[in-house]
Amino acid sequence: MNKIVVSDNIKIENMIYEIRGKNVMLDSDLAMLFGYETKQLNRQVLRNINRFPENYCFQITDTEYISLRCQNGTLKNGRGEHRKYLPYVFTEYGITMLAGILKSELAIKMSLRIVDIFITMKNYINTSLIEQKYFNE
């Protein structure tokens, strides 16, 4: 495996997308953050598929992939442009499980950071909804 160095300045928030009403991250982004190649990460998932029910991980459809590519310039040329297979996406639960099967220090460190970001986003959304409800009354 090639050694990949991940900067602390990476904006993980920009790697979180909404698909099927769930906040998810792409397999390619997680592979980069965890220091793996995408095919290595997906191979580990498929070997441990019983640990990844659909609310943890799922493969997106052609339509979802096209929509994702169009979403705010997501997946710019050169990054995911010529994928052989449709990407897998992972919810926060799947990301935690993924770190457990990869068992690298970097994967564990990054998964903790990612889950913290998911929680922060949920708290922000909940606070915004409460404020909106308060001001609308």
Where are these regions (language model features)?
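Basic, low-complexity intrinsically disordered segments
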Residues: M1-E137
